[in-house]
Curated annotation (Swiss-Prot):
Sites where the protein binds substrate: E168, S189, S236, A237, K286
InterPro entries assigned: HAD-like_sf (IPR036412), HAD_sf (IPR023214), Pyrimidine_nucleotidase_eu (IPR006434)
Active-site residues, record numbering mapped to chain: D119 (nucleophile), D121 (proton donor)
Protein name: Putative cytosolic 5'-nucleotidase 3
Localization terms from the record: Cytoplasm
Phylogenetic lineage: Eukaryota, Metazoa, Ecdysozoa, Nematoda, Chromadorea
């Protein structure tokens, strides 16, 4: 890691709404602890000794809306989570005060007011394996398997990626300039799949042999959301069938709280691919414009005013747009790029509330859900 990034990741502490530059400056607060909080099992025990209960409650009361104060007095675990976030070198929080305010509202609202909207590729799935080798996306499942079975067709998928991938991430093009290229890339790729008439069984087998890997803790995270009846909306510009088959193979079944907004392969009566769902969803149109208003999605998230958004690209930051609500959106972004690209890293800090650098886990998302559940 560069020194510049390391300096920006300084180990600050967040206690009672204030930011401390070193652990020494809060030693005077070590009079009472919060060891009865449900998060005690997941946070370092030494952190609990750094908090004065009265200080935390008073700060929470000052910042919270009047009707929330009594609930916050019972337990306020937000400072504990903030201290964890700000103490980890691989986590960036540009505006701790704003993040703490969003977390407090979510804690008060509880699980019944929460919905998780998440990307899949490189968000719920890992970007690289332990050896640093890049893993597959849902579209990449076809790239890998078709190249093995039908090299000529496989090369067409590779050629498309080589042509359009640099355009997708070009810093010299606006999003509006990129969109026609993304539509062409996705449309051509989908046509290749349909024209080959891949069977459902073949695609399921592709998934079994794929290089898609869950992030560490992903299975527990998804199961925890289901257990607490928190809807999980997987919003992907990839191929939704691949995600469904992957979840079925890893979890045994699709959890009842899980919804998919993605490009779905349609099959004919012989279970062969015959078309893709409309409208086409690419990287830069992941918002309400591609959601059918009559779907169960809108019914199931009615009243879910607090959104936890998980993504890994600029195209993911608007996944909550169009969802009717008046609560906060906490945006958590996975940064998989180079640490030397400080401009890109800074951009992530500007659009995501919390930035996780090269994080192969869902630990932060799990901790957020834990504190929401712990207060009710």
């Amino acid at each position: 890691m560069s020194n510049k990034v390391a300096r920006r990741l300084g180990k600050c502490l967040f206690v009672s709404g204030r930011r401390f530059e070193s652990r020494q400056s809060i030693l005077q607060l070590r009079t009472e602890t919060l060891t009865d909080t449900p998060l005690s099992a997941t946070l370092d025990q030494s952190q609990f000794s750094m908090f004065k209960a009265a200080e935390i409650v008073n700060a929470a009361a000052a910042c919270a809306e009047a009707e929330c104060i009594e609930q916050l007095k019972k337990t306020d675990v937000v400072p504990l989570l903030m201290n964890y976030l700000l103490g980890e070198e691989q986590i960036l929080v540009a505006d701790p005060t704003a993040v703490a305010a969003k977390l407090r509202k979510m804690v008060v609202g509880g699980a019944g007011k929460t919905v998780v909207i998440s990307d899949f590729d490189y968000t719920l799935s890992r970007f690289a394996n332990e050896q640093g080798e890049r893993l597959s996306t849902t579209h990449g499942v076809f790239d890998d398997n078709v190249m093995r079975l039908k090299p000529e067709l496989g090369q067409k998928f590779v050629d498309l990626k080589n042509k359009y991938y640099p355009i997708e991430f070009s810093p010299n093009l606006t999003m509006e300039e990129k969109i026609p290229h993304m539509e062409k890339w996705w449309g051509t790729s989908h046509s290749l799949i349909v024209n080959e008439k891949f069977s459902k069984n073949t695609i399921e087998d592709f998934v079994r042999q794929s290089r898609i890997v869950f992030k560490d803790g992903a299975e527990d995270f998804i199961e925890a959301l289901d257990a607490h009846n928190i809807p999980l909306v997987i919003f992907s510009a990839g191929i939704g069938n691949i995600i469904e088959y992957f979840l079925q193979q890893k979890l045994g079944a699709i959890p009842r709280n899980t919804h998919f907004i993605s490009n779905m392969i349609l099959f004919d009566e012989d279970d062969n691919a015959c078309a893709f769902s409309e409208p086409l969803i690419h990287t830069f149109c992941k918002n309400s414009s591609v959601i059918q208003k009559e779907t169960s999605f809108f019914h199931d998230i009615a009243g879910r005013v607090n959104v936890i958004l998980l993504g890994d690209s600029m195209g993911d930051i608007h996944m909550d747009v169009g969802v009717e609500r008046d609560g906060p959106t906490l945006k958590v972004g996975y940064y998989n790029g180079s640490l030397d690209d400080t401009a890109a890293l800074q951009h992530y800090e500007e659009v995501y509330d919390i930035v996780l650098i090269h994080d192969p886990t869902l630990n932060v998302a799990q901790k957020i859900v834990d504190i929401i559940n712990s207060s009710h």
